[in-house]
Amino acid sequence: MAKTFQKEYYPGIGKIKFEGRESKNPLAFRWYDPEQVVSGKKMKDHLRFAIAYWHSFCGDGSDQFGSPTHFYPWDSVADNDEKIKMRLDAAFEFFTKIGTGYYCF
């Protein structure tokens, strides 16, 4: 994975894999096996998951009822170019680890 910074945003978490329904690993797929063939197509072709970049990495979790609920490392960075690079690094690290092939706005 190409990085613009030398930082891992989700340390200690490897690629999320299918481990089956008996798995006790909270960071494993129990039912979704991307390579399993269902009705002639792989599951990953039936279920094309996408992560909403803006909503997942640019917001602060606030809504009309209250204050922000989460804070990211890049929130406190003053330089906008650096902030954008950090946000993109974190997003693509997440996309890679969870194994989604798509992202959207």
What are the language-model segments listed below?
Residues 1-105:
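N-terminal pre-domain/capping segments
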